[in-house]
Amino acid sequence: MIKKNIFTIFVAAMLIAVIAPHCQAAYTSDWLANTFGTNTTRVGSVARSMWVAPEGVIYTASMWDENEGGVAIYANGKSIGSIGGHGEFQGGAITGNATSIFTALQYNAAYGSGTVGRYGRTSQTRDLLISVSATTAEKRADVITGLATSGSLLYASDFPGNRVRVYTTAGVWQRDINVSGPGALAVDGAGNIWVAQKSAGTILEFDPTGRPRNTIQMSTASRPSALYFDATTVQLMAGDEGPDMNIKTYNISGTPCLVSTFGIQGGYLDTTTGIKGQVGAKRFTRVVGIGKDATGNLYVLNNPWGGTWDLGRDGGTDIHSYGRSGSLQWKLQSLNFEGVAAPDPGTDGAYFYGGTNIYTGSAGGTFVANTVDAIDYPSDPRLNINDLGRGEHFGQLAAVGANRILVAGGQDPDNFYFFHFNAANGYIAIPDATLPGAAFNTAARIREGFCLDSNGDVWAGLDGTNAIWHYALTGFDASGKPTWGAGIPTPIPGTIKPLTRIIYLPESDTMILAQGIVGSTDWTSIGSRVEVYHGWRAGNTTTANPVINITSANPKSITATGNYLFVGYVHTVPNIDAFNLNTGSLDATLTNSSPDTVYVGNDVDSMYGLRSYRRTTGEYVITKDNYNASSVVVYRWTP
Protein backbone atom coordinates (compact mmCIF):
# COMPACT_ATOMS: atom_id res chain seq x y z
CA MET A 1 0.00 0.00 0.00
CA ILE A 2 2.83 2.37 0.89
CA LYS A 3 4.59 1.57 -2.39
CA LYS A 4 1.35 2.21 -4.29
CA ASN A 5 0.92 5.63 -2.65
CA ILE A 6 4.54 6.54 -3.40
CA PHE A 7 4.04 5.51 -7.03
CA THR A 8 0.84 7.59 -7.24
CA ILE A 9 2.61 10.65 -5.83
CA PHE A 10 5.50 10.13 -8.28
CA VAL A 11 3.13 9.93 -11.27
CA ALA A 12 1.27 13.04 -10.11
CA ALA A 13 4.54 14.92 -9.77
CA MET A 14 5.58 13.89 -13.27
CA LEU A 15 2.24 15.03 -14.69
CA ILE A 16 2.60 18.39 -12.98
CA ALA A 17 6.07 18.76 -14.45
CA VAL A 18 4.81 17.91 -17.93
CA ILE A 19 1.89 20.31 -17.93
CA ALA A 20 3.58 23.11 -15.97
CA PRO A 21 4.72 25.11 -19.05
CA HIS A 22 1.09 25.36 -20.16
CA CYS A 23 -0.28 26.51 -16.81
CA GLN A 24 -0.96 30.23 -16.69
CA ALA A 25 0.15 32.42 -13.82
CA ALA A 26 -2.54 34.87 -12.78
CA TYR A 27 -3.12 37.78 -15.14
CA THR A 28 -5.84 40.33 -15.77
CA SER A 29 -7.08 41.97 -18.96
CA ASP A 30 -7.96 45.65 -18.79
CA TRP A 31 -8.16 48.63 -21.12
CA LEU A 32 -7.39 52.34 -21.38
CA ALA A 33 -8.29 55.22 -23.71
CA ASN A 34 -11.94 54.31 -24.35
CA THR A 35 -14.89 54.96 -22.07
CA PHE A 36 -16.20 51.45 -22.71
CA GLY A 37 -14.34 48.19 -23.16
CA THR A 38 -16.44 45.88 -25.34
CA ASN A 39 -16.79 45.89 -29.10
CA THR A 40 -20.51 46.67 -28.90
CA THR A 41 -20.32 49.45 -26.31
CA ARG A 42 -17.05 51.20 -27.20
CA VAL A 43 -16.79 54.82 -28.33
CA GLY A 44 -16.04 55.21 -32.04
CA SER A 45 -12.77 56.38 -33.53
CA VAL A 46 -11.63 59.95 -34.33
CA ALA A 47 -14.90 61.90 -34.51
CA ARG A 48 -14.20 65.19 -36.29
CA SER A 49 -17.73 66.61 -36.62
CA MET A 50 -21.03 66.32 -34.75
CA TRP A 51 -24.75 66.96 -35.07
CA VAL A 52 -27.18 66.73 -32.14
CA ALA A 53 -30.87 65.95 -32.68
CA PRO A 54 -33.44 67.76 -30.50
CA GLU A 55 -34.13 64.55 -28.54
CA GLY A 56 -30.44 64.36 -27.59
CA VAL A 57 -29.26 61.71 -30.06
CA ILE A 58 -25.69 62.50 -31.15
CA TYR A 59 -24.26 61.72 -34.59
CA THR A 60 -20.51 62.01 -35.23
CA ALA A 61 -18.51 61.49 -38.42
CA SER A 62 -15.12 59.83 -38.77
CA MET A 63 -12.91 59.06 -41.75
CA TRP A 64 -12.18 55.57 -40.45
CA ASP A 65 -13.45 53.15 -37.85
CA GLU A 66 -12.13 49.62 -38.09
CA ASN A 67 -15.07 47.81 -36.49
CA GLU A 68 -18.18 49.91 -37.13
CA GLY A 69 -19.67 52.51 -39.45
CA GLY A 70 -17.99 55.88 -39.68
CA VAL A 71 -21.08 57.73 -38.45
CA ALA A 72 -21.41 56.80 -34.77
CA ILE A 73 -24.64 57.29 -32.83
CA TYR A 74 -24.85 58.03 -29.09
CA ALA A 75 -27.56 58.79 -26.55
CA ASN A 76 -27.45 59.33 -22.79
CA GLY A 77 -23.71 58.78 -22.69
CA LYS A 78 -23.76 55.44 -24.47
CA SER A 79 -23.19 54.09 -27.96
CA ILE A 80 -26.42 53.01 -29.68
CA GLY A 81 -25.17 52.11 -33.15
CA SER A 82 -23.54 53.38 -36.31
CA ILE A 83 -24.23 54.09 -39.97
CA GLY A 84 -22.34 53.17 -43.12
CA GLY A 85 -19.02 51.51 -43.82
CA HIS A 86 -15.87 51.97 -41.79
CA GLY A 87 -14.16 53.95 -44.56
CA GLU A 88 -17.16 55.62 -46.21
CA PHE A 89 -17.06 59.12 -44.77
CA GLN A 90 -14.63 62.03 -44.81
CA GLY A 91 -15.42 62.99 -41.23
CA GLY A 92 -15.09 66.76 -41.55
CA ALA A 93 -18.77 67.77 -41.72
CA ILE A 94 -22.17 66.40 -40.67
CA THR A 95 -25.68 67.74 -40.11
CA GLY A 96 -29.21 66.44 -39.95
CA ASN A 97 -32.93 67.01 -39.59
CA ALA A 98 -35.91 65.03 -38.34
CA THR A 99 -35.57 62.33 -41.00
CA SER A 100 -32.05 62.42 -42.45
CA ILE A 101 -28.34 62.72 -41.81
CA PHE A 102 -26.15 64.58 -44.32
CA THR A 103 -22.40 64.05 -44.22
CA ALA A 104 -19.33 64.54 -46.39
CA LEU A 105 -18.17 61.37 -48.11
CA GLN A 106 -14.62 60.12 -48.46
CA TYR A 107 -13.04 60.01 -51.91
CA ASN A 108 -14.42 57.14 -53.93
CA ALA A 109 -13.56 55.99 -57.45
CA ALA A 110 -17.23 56.12 -58.40
CA TYR A 111 -17.92 59.76 -57.47
CA GLY A 112 -14.58 61.25 -56.38
CA SER A 113 -14.40 63.77 -53.54
CA GLY A 114 -16.63 66.72 -52.70
CA THR A 115 -19.82 64.68 -52.37
CA VAL A 116 -22.45 64.65 -49.63
CA GLY A 117 -24.43 61.55 -48.77
CA ARG A 118 -27.95 61.60 -47.34
CA TYR A 119 -28.85 58.77 -44.95
CA GLY A 120 -32.20 57.92 -43.40
CA ARG A 121 -32.11 58.20 -39.63
CA THR A 122 -34.49 55.26 -39.37
CA SER A 123 -33.27 53.12 -42.27
CA GLN A 124 -29.61 54.05 -41.62
CA THR A 125 -28.93 53.60 -45.33
CA ARG A 126 -27.86 56.08 -47.99
CA ASP A 127 -30.64 57.25 -50.27
CA LEU A 128 -29.07 60.22 -52.08
CA LEU A 129 -25.74 61.53 -53.38
CA ILE A 130 -25.24 65.28 -53.80
CA SER A 131 -22.21 66.44 -55.79
CA VAL A 132 -21.11 69.68 -54.15
CA SER A 133 -17.61 70.54 -55.37
CA ALA A 134 -15.79 70.61 -58.69
CA THR A 135 -12.76 69.33 -56.75
CA THR A 136 -13.33 65.62 -57.21
CA ALA A 137 -9.79 64.22 -57.07
CA GLU A 138 -8.79 65.18 -53.50
CA LYS A 139 -8.02 62.00 -51.54
CA ARG A 140 -6.85 63.47 -48.26
CA ALA A 141 -7.94 66.98 -47.28
CA ASP A 142 -11.48 68.06 -46.45
CA VAL A 143 -13.26 69.47 -49.49
CA ILE A 144 -16.59 70.01 -47.74
CA THR A 145 -15.84 71.86 -44.52
CA GLY A 146 -19.30 72.70 -43.20
CA LEU A 147 -22.90 71.49 -43.42
CA ALA A 148 -26.18 72.82 -42.02
CA THR A 149 -29.89 72.37 -42.60
CA SER A 150 -32.83 74.70 -42.11
CA GLY A 151 -36.33 73.70 -43.09
CA SER A 152 -36.18 72.24 -46.59
CA LEU A 153 -32.70 73.60 -47.35
CA LEU A 154 -29.20 72.14 -47.08
CA TYR A 155 -26.10 74.35 -46.94
CA ALA A 156 -22.60 73.08 -47.78
CA SER A 157 -19.20 74.78 -47.60
CA ASP A 158 -17.17 74.04 -50.74
CA PHE A 159 -13.75 75.02 -49.42
CA PRO A 160 -11.68 74.84 -52.64
CA GLY A 161 -14.58 76.36 -54.59
CA ASN A 162 -14.71 79.37 -52.21
CA ARG A 163 -18.47 79.19 -51.97
CA VAL A 164 -21.35 78.03 -49.83
CA ARG A 165 -23.76 76.00 -51.92
CA VAL A 166 -27.48 75.89 -51.18
CA TYR A 167 -29.63 72.87 -52.07
CA THR A 168 -32.98 71.52 -51.11
CA THR A 169 -32.72 68.55 -48.81
CA ALA A 170 -33.74 66.53 -51.87
CA GLY A 171 -30.48 67.61 -53.53
CA VAL A 172 -31.78 70.28 -55.92
CA TRP A 173 -29.34 73.19 -56.27
CA GLN A 174 -30.74 76.63 -55.40
CA ARG A 175 -27.91 79.15 -55.31
CA ASP A 176 -24.25 79.79 -54.43
CA ILE A 177 -22.84 82.30 -51.97
CA ASN A 178 -19.29 83.42 -52.68
CA VAL A 179 -17.11 83.10 -49.58
CA SER A 180 -13.34 82.78 -49.40
CA GLY A 181 -12.33 79.66 -47.48
CA PRO A 182 -15.72 78.77 -45.96
CA GLY A 183 -15.84 76.44 -42.97
CA ALA A 184 -18.37 75.69 -40.25
CA LEU A 185 -21.98 76.76 -40.88
CA ALA A 186 -25.09 77.69 -38.91
CA VAL A 187 -28.49 79.03 -39.95
CA ASP A 188 -30.46 81.27 -37.58
CA GLY A 189 -34.21 81.48 -37.03
CA ALA A 190 -34.63 84.10 -39.76
CA GLY A 191 -32.85 81.96 -42.34
CA ASN A 192 -29.63 83.98 -42.26
CA ILE A 193 -26.49 81.93 -42.94
CA TRP A 194 -23.43 82.24 -40.70
CA VAL A 195 -20.12 81.11 -42.20
CA ALA A 196 -16.86 80.67 -40.30
CA GLN A 197 -13.59 81.57 -42.01
CA LYS A 198 -11.26 79.72 -39.68
CA SER A 199 -7.90 80.99 -40.87
CA ALA A 200 -9.15 84.61 -40.97
CA GLY A 201 -10.77 84.52 -37.53
CA THR A 202 -14.06 85.83 -38.91
CA ILE A 203 -17.70 84.76 -39.04
CA LEU A 204 -19.73 86.18 -41.91
CA GLU A 205 -23.52 86.61 -42.02
CA PHE A 206 -25.59 86.40 -45.22
CA ASP A 207 -29.32 86.87 -45.62
CA PRO A 208 -31.40 84.02 -47.09
CA THR A 209 -30.77 85.31 -50.62
CA GLY A 210 -27.00 85.35 -50.13
CA ARG A 211 -26.48 89.08 -49.60
CA PRO A 212 -23.79 90.02 -47.04
CA ARG A 213 -24.93 91.36 -43.70
CA ASN A 214 -22.81 91.44 -40.55
CA THR A 215 -19.25 90.32 -39.85
CA ILE A 216 -17.99 89.06 -36.52
CA GLN A 217 -14.30 89.85 -36.41
CA MET A 218 -12.67 87.77 -33.72
CA SER A 219 -9.10 88.30 -32.56
CA THR A 220 -6.40 87.67 -35.13
CA ALA A 221 -5.38 84.53 -33.24
CA SER A 222 -8.90 83.09 -33.03
CA ARG A 223 -9.82 80.12 -35.21
CA PRO A 224 -13.61 79.58 -35.38
CA SER A 225 -13.94 75.84 -35.88
CA ALA A 226 -17.57 75.06 -35.02
CA LEU A 227 -20.86 77.00 -35.09
CA TYR A 228 -24.26 76.43 -33.49
CA PHE A 229 -27.38 78.64 -33.48
CA ASP A 230 -29.34 78.45 -30.22
CA ALA A 231 -32.94 79.27 -31.16
CA THR A 232 -34.00 79.52 -27.51
CA THR A 233 -31.61 82.35 -26.67
CA VAL A 234 -31.24 83.73 -30.23
CA GLN A 235 -27.50 83.42 -29.84
CA LEU A 236 -24.68 82.08 -31.99
CA MET A 237 -22.11 79.82 -30.36
CA ALA A 238 -18.64 79.55 -31.92
CA GLY A 239 -15.94 77.07 -31.00
CA ASP A 240 -12.50 78.68 -31.05
CA GLU A 241 -9.47 76.42 -31.52
CA GLY A 242 -7.10 79.37 -31.29
CA PRO A 243 -5.24 80.14 -28.05
CA ASP A 244 -8.51 80.76 -26.15
CA MET A 245 -9.65 77.12 -26.70
CA ASN A 246 -13.20 77.95 -25.64
CA ILE A 247 -16.72 78.59 -26.92
CA LYS A 248 -17.79 82.18 -27.57
CA THR A 249 -21.46 83.17 -27.52
CA TYR A 250 -22.77 86.13 -29.54
CA ASN A 251 -26.11 87.89 -29.32
CA ILE A 252 -27.24 88.19 -32.94
CA SER A 253 -30.67 89.76 -32.43
CA GLY A 254 -29.15 93.01 -33.71
CA THR A 255 -25.55 93.90 -34.38
CA PRO A 256 -23.62 90.83 -33.19
CA CYS A 257 -21.87 91.24 -29.86
CA LEU A 258 -19.99 88.86 -27.59
CA VAL A 259 -22.07 88.15 -24.48
CA SER A 260 -20.31 85.23 -22.81
CA THR A 261 -17.80 82.43 -23.10
CA PHE A 262 -17.98 78.80 -22.04
CA GLY A 263 -14.90 76.87 -21.07
CA ILE A 264 -11.71 77.78 -19.27
CA GLN A 265 -9.76 80.52 -21.03
CA GLY A 266 -6.85 78.76 -22.69
CA GLY A 267 -8.51 75.36 -22.45
CA TYR A 268 -6.17 72.47 -21.81
CA LEU A 269 -3.16 74.83 -21.96
CA ASP A 270 -4.34 76.96 -19.03
CA THR A 271 -2.04 76.90 -15.99
CA THR A 272 -4.23 78.78 -13.49
CA THR A 273 -6.72 75.94 -12.90
CA GLY A 274 -4.62 72.93 -13.85
CA ILE A 275 -1.39 71.64 -15.32
CA LYS A 276 -0.54 72.71 -18.85
CA GLY A 277 -1.79 70.00 -21.20
CA GLN A 278 -4.31 68.66 -18.69
CA VAL A 279 -7.70 67.91 -20.24
CA GLY A 280 -11.02 67.67 -18.41
CA ALA A 281 -14.26 69.53 -17.79
CA LYS A 282 -14.22 72.80 -19.76
CA ARG A 283 -10.50 72.36 -20.54
CA PHE A 284 -11.12 72.06 -24.27
CA THR A 285 -8.67 71.16 -27.02
CA ARG A 286 -9.96 71.59 -30.59
CA VAL A 287 -13.70 72.31 -30.40
CA VAL A 288 -15.00 70.84 -33.66
CA GLY A 289 -18.66 70.33 -32.77
CA ILE A 290 -21.32 72.11 -30.70
CA GLY A 291 -24.96 71.15 -30.22
CA LYS A 292 -27.88 71.36 -27.81
CA ASP A 293 -30.91 69.19 -27.24
CA ALA A 294 -34.46 70.38 -26.60
CA THR A 295 -33.96 70.37 -22.83
CA GLY A 296 -30.93 72.65 -23.00
CA ASN A 297 -28.10 70.17 -22.48
CA LEU A 298 -24.93 71.28 -24.25
CA TYR A 299 -22.73 68.84 -26.15
CA VAL A 300 -19.15 69.68 -27.11
CA LEU A 301 -16.99 67.59 -29.41
CA ASN A 302 -13.25 68.00 -28.94
CA ASN A 303 -10.68 66.63 -31.35
CA PRO A 304 -7.45 66.42 -29.29
CA TRP A 305 -4.38 67.70 -31.10
CA GLY A 306 -2.11 65.37 -33.04
CA GLY A 307 -2.36 64.16 -36.61
CA THR A 308 -0.62 64.20 -39.96
CA TRP A 309 -2.07 63.73 -43.46
CA ASP A 310 -4.26 60.76 -42.53
CA LEU A 311 -7.42 62.39 -41.17
CA GLY A 312 -8.62 58.98 -40.04
CA ARG A 313 -5.94 59.23 -37.33
CA ASP A 314 -6.26 62.93 -36.52
CA GLY A 315 -6.76 63.32 -32.79
CA GLY A 316 -9.44 61.18 -31.11
CA THR A 317 -13.05 61.28 -29.94
CA ASP A 318 -13.81 63.45 -26.89
CA ILE A 319 -17.50 64.32 -26.36
CA HIS A 320 -18.59 66.27 -23.27
CA SER A 321 -22.18 66.69 -22.06
CA TYR A 322 -22.99 69.71 -19.87
CA GLY A 323 -26.28 70.40 -18.09
CA ARG A 324 -28.17 73.70 -18.18
CA SER A 325 -26.13 74.89 -15.19
CA GLY A 326 -22.91 74.25 -17.08
CA SER A 327 -21.84 71.27 -14.99
CA LEU A 328 -20.25 68.27 -16.68
CA GLN A 329 -22.63 65.30 -16.89
CA TRP A 330 -20.59 62.71 -18.77
CA LYS A 331 -17.82 62.19 -21.30
CA LEU A 332 -17.40 59.80 -24.20
CA GLN A 333 -13.76 59.32 -25.21
CA SER A 334 -11.65 57.09 -27.38
CA LEU A 335 -8.09 56.68 -28.53
CA ASN A 336 -6.96 57.70 -31.94
CA PHE A 337 -7.70 54.93 -34.48
CA GLU A 338 -4.40 53.21 -33.72
CA GLY A 339 -1.73 53.77 -31.13
CA VAL A 340 -0.20 52.49 -27.92
CA ALA A 341 0.73 53.99 -24.56
CA ALA A 342 3.87 53.01 -22.65
CA PRO A 343 3.80 52.45 -18.87
CA ASP A 344 5.65 55.25 -17.10
CA PRO A 345 8.58 54.03 -14.96
CA GLY A 346 8.53 57.36 -13.12
CA THR A 347 5.16 56.48 -11.57
CA ASP A 348 5.89 52.73 -11.34
CA GLY A 349 3.49 52.08 -14.20
CA ALA A 350 0.56 54.14 -12.90
CA TYR A 351 0.59 56.50 -15.90
CA PHE A 352 0.79 55.65 -19.59
CA TYR A 353 2.31 57.83 -22.31
CA GLY A 354 1.11 57.57 -25.89
CA GLY A 355 2.48 59.49 -28.83
CA THR A 356 0.13 62.42 -28.12
CA ASN A 357 -1.84 61.62 -24.95
CA ILE A 358 -1.36 60.52 -21.33
CA TYR A 359 -3.68 58.12 -19.49
CA THR A 360 -4.02 56.58 -16.05
CA GLY A 361 -6.36 54.27 -14.16
CA SER A 362 -8.24 51.14 -15.17
CA ALA A 363 -11.54 50.07 -16.79
CA GLY A 364 -11.14 52.72 -19.47
CA GLY A 365 -8.99 54.86 -17.27
CA THR A 366 -8.72 58.63 -17.30
CA PHE A 367 -7.61 60.75 -20.24
CA VAL A 368 -5.12 62.91 -18.35
CA ALA A 369 -3.48 65.12 -20.94
CA ASN A 370 -2.93 66.00 -24.57
CA THR A 371 0.84 66.51 -24.89
CA VAL A 372 0.73 68.54 -28.14
CA ASP A 373 0.86 72.34 -27.88
CA ALA A 374 0.01 73.70 -31.32
CA ILE A 375 0.22 77.29 -30.11
CA ASP A 376 3.77 77.40 -28.71
CA TYR A 377 5.14 74.60 -30.90
CA PRO A 378 3.38 74.85 -34.28
CA SER A 379 6.27 72.95 -35.93
CA ASP A 380 5.75 69.90 -33.71
CA PRO A 381 6.17 66.97 -36.12
CA ARG A 382 3.04 65.39 -34.66
CA LEU A 383 1.12 68.15 -36.47
CA ASN A 384 2.97 68.00 -39.78
CA ILE A 385 0.50 67.10 -42.54
CA ASN A 386 3.44 66.31 -44.83
CA ASP A 387 4.99 63.84 -42.42
CA LEU A 388 5.78 60.46 -43.96
CA GLY A 389 3.91 58.68 -41.17
CA ARG A 390 0.15 58.41 -40.89
CA GLY A 391 0.17 59.76 -37.33
CA GLU A 392 2.71 59.59 -34.52
CA HIS A 393 0.52 57.87 -31.93
CA PHE A 394 2.83 55.10 -30.71
CA GLY A 395 4.70 56.15 -27.58
CA GLN A 396 7.98 54.92 -26.08
CA LEU A 397 9.13 56.37 -22.77
CA ALA A 398 12.22 56.52 -20.58
CA ALA A 399 12.34 58.04 -17.09
CA VAL A 400 15.87 59.07 -16.15
CA GLY A 401 15.93 60.57 -12.69
CA ALA A 402 13.40 63.40 -12.72
CA ASN A 403 13.51 63.63 -16.52
CA ARG A 404 11.35 61.88 -19.09
CA ILE A 405 12.10 61.24 -22.75
CA LEU A 406 9.19 60.50 -25.07
CA VAL A 407 9.65 58.98 -28.50
CA ALA A 408 6.69 59.09 -30.88
CA GLY A 409 6.39 56.96 -33.98
CA GLY A 410 3.82 55.70 -36.44
CA GLN A 411 2.32 52.32 -37.23
CA ASP A 412 5.33 51.02 -39.17
CA PRO A 413 7.91 53.77 -38.74
CA ASP A 414 11.37 54.25 -40.13
CA ASN A 415 11.74 57.63 -38.45
CA PHE A 416 11.24 58.61 -34.80
CA TYR A 417 10.59 61.88 -32.97
CA PHE A 418 12.05 62.79 -29.56
CA PHE A 419 10.50 65.03 -26.90
CA HIS A 420 11.16 66.12 -23.33
CA PHE A 421 9.10 67.53 -20.46
CA ASN A 422 9.72 70.17 -17.82
CA ALA A 423 7.86 71.84 -14.97
CA ALA A 424 7.10 75.03 -16.88
CA ASN A 425 5.35 73.12 -19.66
CA GLY A 426 3.60 70.55 -17.48
CA TYR A 427 2.34 67.65 -19.57
CA ILE A 428 3.38 69.21 -22.89
CA ALA A 429 6.00 67.23 -24.80
CA ILE A 430 8.57 69.66 -26.18
CA PRO A 431 10.03 68.70 -29.59
CA ASP A 432 13.76 67.95 -29.54
CA ALA A 433 15.15 65.76 -32.30
CA THR A 434 14.44 63.36 -35.12
CA LEU A 435 16.08 60.07 -36.03
CA PRO A 436 17.26 60.20 -38.76
CA GLY A 437 18.33 63.78 -38.28
CA ALA A 438 21.07 66.21 -37.31
CA ALA A 439 21.02 65.31 -33.60
CA PHE A 440 22.18 61.80 -34.52
CA ASN A 441 24.26 62.83 -37.54
CA THR A 442 22.56 60.46 -39.95
CA ALA A 443 20.14 60.54 -42.86
CA ALA A 444 19.69 56.76 -42.92
CA ARG A 445 16.23 55.39 -42.29
CA ILE A 446 15.62 53.06 -39.34
CA ARG A 447 14.79 49.79 -41.08
CA GLU A 448 16.57 47.27 -38.81
CA GLY A 449 15.15 48.01 -35.38
CA PHE A 450 14.88 50.81 -32.82
CA CYS A 451 15.02 50.97 -29.04
CA LEU A 452 14.90 53.71 -26.44
CA ASP A 453 16.25 51.90 -23.39
CA SER A 454 15.44 52.62 -19.75
CA ASN A 455 18.63 54.69 -19.36
CA GLY A 456 17.60 56.97 -22.22
CA ASP A 457 20.16 55.52 -24.63
CA VAL A 458 19.14 54.98 -28.25
CA TRP A 459 19.81 51.83 -30.26
CA ALA A 460 19.08 51.82 -33.98
CA GLY A 461 19.58 49.67 -37.03
CA LEU A 462 20.43 52.24 -39.69
CA ASP A 463 19.42 51.08 -43.13
CA GLY A 464 22.31 49.95 -45.31
CA THR A 465 25.00 50.12 -42.60
CA ASN A 466 24.99 46.45 -41.49
CA ALA A 467 25.40 47.67 -37.91
CA ILE A 468 23.57 48.29 -34.66
CA TRP A 469 24.23 51.88 -33.63
CA HIS A 470 24.35 52.91 -29.99
CA TYR A 471 23.83 56.57 -29.05
CA ALA A 472 24.52 57.01 -25.33
CA LEU A 473 22.56 59.66 -23.45
CA THR A 474 25.05 62.30 -22.31
CA GLY A 475 22.72 64.37 -20.15
CA PHE A 476 20.03 67.04 -19.97
CA ASP A 477 20.30 70.81 -20.13
CA ALA A 478 18.60 73.13 -17.63
CA SER A 479 15.30 72.93 -19.52
CA GLY A 480 15.30 69.13 -19.53
CA LYS A 481 16.36 68.73 -23.15
CA PRO A 482 18.38 65.53 -23.67
CA THR A 483 21.52 65.11 -25.77
CA TRP A 484 23.23 62.00 -27.05
CA GLY A 485 26.80 61.18 -27.95
CA ALA A 486 28.13 60.03 -31.30
CA GLY A 487 26.85 56.73 -32.57
CA ILE A 488 28.99 53.65 -31.96
CA PRO A 489 28.38 50.79 -34.41
CA THR A 490 28.48 47.07 -33.68
CA PRO A 491 28.24 44.64 -36.61
CA ILE A 492 24.94 42.80 -36.87
CA PRO A 493 25.51 39.11 -36.06
CA GLY A 494 25.28 37.10 -39.25
CA THR A 495 22.93 34.57 -37.68
CA ILE A 496 20.17 37.16 -37.22
CA LYS A 497 20.18 38.83 -40.64
CA PRO A 498 18.01 40.41 -41.88
CA LEU A 499 17.65 42.23 -38.58
CA THR A 500 14.27 43.83 -37.94
CA ARG A 501 13.90 44.54 -34.18
CA ILE A 502 16.27 45.64 -31.39
CA ILE A 503 15.59 45.68 -27.64
CA TYR A 504 18.29 46.44 -25.08
CA LEU A 505 17.75 45.95 -21.31
CA PRO A 506 20.50 47.85 -19.45
CA GLU A 507 19.52 46.47 -16.04
CA SER A 508 20.77 43.03 -17.09
CA ASP A 509 22.98 44.04 -20.04
CA THR A 510 20.78 41.95 -22.32
CA MET A 511 20.38 42.51 -26.06
CA ILE A 512 17.42 40.99 -27.89
CA LEU A 513 17.53 40.83 -31.68
CA ALA A 514 14.69 39.65 -33.92
CA GLN A 515 15.18 38.40 -37.44
CA GLY A 516 13.04 39.51 -40.34
CA ILE A 517 11.66 37.16 -42.96
CA VAL A 518 14.59 35.74 -44.90
CA GLY A 519 14.31 36.53 -48.59
CA SER A 520 11.55 39.11 -48.11
CA THR A 521 11.74 42.84 -48.82
CA ASP A 522 9.16 43.56 -46.09
CA TRP A 523 11.32 45.14 -43.40
CA THR A 524 8.32 45.62 -41.08
CA SER A 525 7.71 41.90 -40.44
CA ILE A 526 9.32 39.50 -37.98
CA GLY A 527 10.35 35.97 -38.85
CA SER A 528 10.64 33.12 -36.36
CA ARG A 529 14.10 33.63 -34.83
CA VAL A 530 14.95 35.80 -31.82
CA GLU A 531 18.46 35.85 -30.36
CA VAL A 532 19.17 36.83 -26.75
CA TYR A 533 22.67 38.07 -25.86
CA HIS A 534 23.49 38.30 -22.16
CA GLY A 535 26.45 40.62 -21.48
CA TRP A 536 26.23 42.58 -24.74
CA ARG A 537 28.03 45.72 -23.57
CA ALA A 538 30.45 43.54 -21.62
CA GLY A 539 31.60 42.16 -24.95
CA ASN A 540 29.30 39.27 -25.87
CA THR A 541 28.07 40.39 -29.29
CA THR A 542 28.45 37.06 -31.07
CA THR A 543 27.07 34.24 -28.90
CA ALA A 544 23.32 34.13 -28.39
CA ASN A 545 21.87 32.10 -25.54
CA PRO A 546 19.03 31.34 -25.65
CA VAL A 547 17.75 31.43 -29.20
CA ILE A 548 13.97 31.68 -29.17
CA ASN A 549 12.06 29.97 -31.94
CA ILE A 550 8.64 31.54 -32.49
CA THR A 551 6.33 28.84 -33.80
CA SER A 552 3.10 30.84 -34.06
CA ALA A 553 2.40 32.53 -37.39
CA ASN A 554 3.04 36.18 -38.22
CA PRO A 555 4.82 37.74 -35.22
CA LYS A 556 4.64 41.51 -35.61
CA SER A 557 5.54 43.35 -32.42
CA ILE A 558 7.83 42.54 -29.50
CA THR A 559 8.65 44.17 -26.19
CA ALA A 560 10.76 43.07 -23.24
CA THR A 561 11.33 43.92 -19.61
CA GLY A 562 12.68 42.06 -16.61
CA ASN A 563 12.99 38.37 -17.47
CA TYR A 564 10.50 38.21 -20.32
CA LEU A 565 10.05 38.84 -24.00
CA PHE A 566 6.47 39.47 -25.11
CA VAL A 567 5.38 38.74 -28.68
CA GLY A 568 2.21 39.84 -30.49
CA TYR A 569 0.92 38.62 -33.84
CA VAL A 570 -0.82 40.10 -36.88
CA HIS A 571 -3.70 38.67 -38.94
CA THR A 572 -3.89 35.59 -36.71
CA VAL A 573 -4.62 35.84 -32.98
CA PRO A 574 -4.80 38.56 -30.31
CA ASN A 575 -2.58 36.50 -28.00
CA ILE A 576 0.55 37.80 -26.31
CA ASP A 577 3.19 35.12 -25.72
CA ALA A 578 5.66 35.49 -22.84
CA PHE A 579 9.08 33.91 -23.46
CA ASN A 580 11.64 33.47 -20.69
CA LEU A 581 14.83 35.36 -21.54
CA ASN A 582 16.99 32.93 -19.57
CA THR A 583 15.62 29.63 -20.84
CA GLY A 584 13.90 30.63 -24.08
CA SER A 585 10.79 28.74 -23.01
CA LEU A 586 7.25 29.90 -23.65
CA ASP A 587 6.06 30.42 -20.07
CA ALA A 588 2.64 31.98 -20.65
CA THR A 589 0.14 33.10 -23.25
CA LEU A 590 -2.01 36.10 -22.38
CA THR A 591 -5.40 36.00 -24.10
CA ASN A 592 -8.37 37.54 -22.29
CA SER A 593 -9.25 37.01 -18.65
CA SER A 594 -12.42 39.14 -18.86
CA PRO A 595 -14.14 38.66 -22.25
CA ASP A 596 -17.45 40.00 -20.91
CA THR A 597 -15.95 43.41 -20.12
CA VAL A 598 -12.87 43.74 -22.34
CA TYR A 599 -12.52 43.28 -26.09
CA VAL A 600 -8.84 42.71 -26.84
CA GLY A 601 -9.11 43.02 -30.63
CA ASN A 602 -7.91 40.72 -33.39
CA ASP A 603 -4.13 41.16 -33.43
CA VAL A 604 -1.29 43.69 -33.31
CA ASP A 605 -0.92 45.39 -36.68
CA SER A 606 2.01 47.67 -35.83
CA MET A 607 5.76 47.31 -35.41
CA TYR A 608 5.93 48.90 -31.95
CA GLY A 609 2.37 48.17 -30.81
CA LEU A 610 3.47 46.45 -27.58
CA ARG A 611 5.07 48.15 -24.56
CA SER A 612 5.99 46.66 -21.19
CA TYR A 613 7.27 47.47 -17.72
CA ARG A 614 8.03 45.43 -14.59
CA ARG A 615 6.73 47.19 -11.50
CA THR A 616 8.59 47.23 -8.19
CA THR A 617 6.08 44.64 -6.95
CA GLY A 618 7.23 42.19 -9.62
CA GLU A 619 4.05 42.62 -11.63
CA TYR A 620 4.47 42.92 -15.39
CA VAL A 621 2.36 45.53 -17.18
CA ILE A 622 2.00 44.97 -20.93
CA THR A 623 0.10 47.36 -23.20
CA LYS A 624 -1.18 46.51 -26.66
CA ASP A 625 -2.43 48.55 -29.60
CA ASN A 626 -6.12 47.68 -30.13
CA TYR A 627 -7.10 49.33 -33.41
CA ASN A 628 -10.28 47.26 -33.53
CA ALA A 629 -11.72 49.01 -30.49
CA SER A 630 -9.87 52.36 -30.51
CA SER A 631 -8.30 51.56 -27.16
CA VAL A 632 -5.18 50.27 -25.45
CA VAL A 633 -5.33 46.79 -23.92
CA VAL A 634 -3.53 46.46 -20.58
CA TYR A 635 -2.38 43.08 -19.26
CA ARG A 636 -1.16 42.74 -15.68
CA TRP A 637 0.73 39.52 -15.04
CA THR A 638 2.67 38.15 -12.10
CA PRO A 639 4.72 35.06 -13.05
Q: What is the meaning of each model-derived region?
A:
Residues 57-60, 100-103, 154-156, 192-195, ...:
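Conserved beta-propeller blade signature
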Residues 69-73, 114-118, 162-165, 201-204, ...:
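A short loop-to-beta-strand structural motif that recurs across blades of beta-propeller domains
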Residues 74-78, 119-124, 167-172, 206-211, ...:
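Short loop/turn segments that connect beta-strands within beta-propeller blades
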Residues 340-341, 352, 358-361, 602-639:
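Blade-level signature of beta-propeller repeat domains, shared across WD40, Kelch, NHL, RCC1
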